[in-house]
Every structure is written in C-alpha cells, then in structure tokens.
C-alpha cells in the first residue's frame, strides 16, 4: 500500500517532536527545581529607655474590622499591647491614632483612644501623608515615636519612613505589629530596618532611624 507523501511528512514531524521533547525534558526538569532562598535574620530586639515628654505612641489600625480577620492581630498583638498601653498611659506619653475615617469608631477596647489623644483620618498607608500628624506632634515637642499596629509590611513601615524623613527617631516593638504570615512579618522587619537611615545592626535609638524593640524591653524615664 502506498501512503500519500503528506502522511510520510507528518510521521517524520511527529517523530522529531517526540524525540526533541525527550531531549529537552532534562533541561525542563532542571529549570523546574525549587530554589530555596535564605530568610534574612531579624536582629534581637534592643532595650531602650525613653523620655515620656518627648516620646509619642502612634497606634495604627487596631480596629475591629481588621483584627477580627487577622489571627496574628488578635492572638499576638493585642495580648502584648494591652499591658503596654496601660504603662504608656501611666507614664503620660502623647498618644496618636491613625486609621481610615470609617474605622474611627471601631478601635479595640484594649487600646481605645482617650478624649485628649490625637486622631488622624488617613487616605494612605503613611499616616503623615496629607494629615496634620507631624504638625500636632511637633507642637508637643515630640522627637521619638513608638509605632505599633497593623501591619509591619504595610502601614507601620510606610509611617516609619514618613517619620524618619521628618526627623523623628522611631521605635517599633516587635510584639505589637505583625502581618498575615511569619514570612511577611520577617520581610517587613528587614525592610523597615533598611529604609531611610538604615539600621541593619539595630543600634538602640539610632537618630532618625528605626530600632526594633519589644514591650518588655521599653522603659520610660
């Protein structure tokens, strides 16, 4: 039986594709191998002593609408923040709150604003952007900010950078902020230490830079 010439051509083409695919398979397998990247190490939190008269606590997004959906906020941040807020109030620090306007009535009771506290309605993750936060803090002689809240890979980092470019020294207690995953949280800490006046060694209270601390390592004097 004689086959059409076109059939013979298609057979040759199919064979070429088959063997070509077989030869290419090792290269594809190699390319598909998972590459493991080493996570950046988070430095040990630093012990710091702060002057209550020139230090302010800035609270970001500790609100029901967010924390109800975020286990790390409910289970890690709030338990650390509750006793710390009591100490902040007792020491007489200036306290400022920043969230979107629709969330201002949703602050968690553990960190709820007092009548005299500063409040800003933000439209961006950086709470200094398009608000009077800087003006109100400087009017009170504030030089150092403790920034807490949701989340380290978002508003906390953006606000910390906004603070540094406005000449504030920033302290971030690692137990009062987080993100949805451990990976995102670790990257957030790495990024904030690399931002602005970088402080990769986590030098305590490096001027106009971020220091990572922890609530039990912060004293007021």
Indicate residue ranges for each PLM-predicted region.
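Sec/Tat signal peptide C-region and signal peptidase I cleavage site
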Residues: 18-24
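A short alpha/beta connector and helix-capping loop motif
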Residues: 53, 70-88, 93-97
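Acidic/histidine-rich, surface-exposed loop or edge segments in extracytoplasmic proteins
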Residues: 57-69
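Surface-exposed cleft-lining segments at the edges of enzyme active sites
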Residues: 66-73, 146
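Bacterial N-terminal signal peptides
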Residues: 8-18
């Amino acid at each position: 039986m004689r086959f059409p010439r076109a059939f013979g051509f298609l057979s040759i083409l199919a064979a070429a594709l088959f063997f070509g695919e077989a030869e290419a398979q090792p290269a594809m397998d190699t390319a598909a191998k998972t590459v493991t990247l080493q996570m950046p190490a988070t430095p040990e939190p630093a012990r710091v002593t702060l002057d209550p008269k020139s230090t302010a606590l800035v609270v970001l997004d500790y609100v029901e609408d967010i924390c109800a959906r975020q286990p790390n906020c409910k289970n890690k941040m709030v338990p650390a923040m509750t006793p710390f807020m009591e100490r902040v109030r007792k020491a007489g620090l200036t306290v400022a709150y920043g969230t979107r306007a629709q969330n201002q009535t949703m602050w968690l009771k553990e960190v709820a604003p007092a009548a005299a506290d500063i409040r800003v309605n933000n439209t961006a993750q950086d709470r200094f952007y398009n608000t009077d936060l800087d003006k109100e803090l400087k009017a009170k002689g504030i030089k150092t900010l403790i920034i807490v809240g949701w989340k380290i890979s978002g508003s906390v980092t953006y606000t910390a950078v906004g603070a540094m470019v406005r000449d504030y020294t920033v302290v971030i207690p690692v137990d009062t902020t987080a993100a949805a995953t451990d990976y995102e949280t670790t990257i957030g800490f790495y990024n904030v230490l690399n931002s602005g006046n970088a402080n990769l060694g986590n030098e305590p209270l490096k001027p106009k830079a971020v220091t990572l601390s922890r609530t039990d390592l912060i004293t007021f004097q």
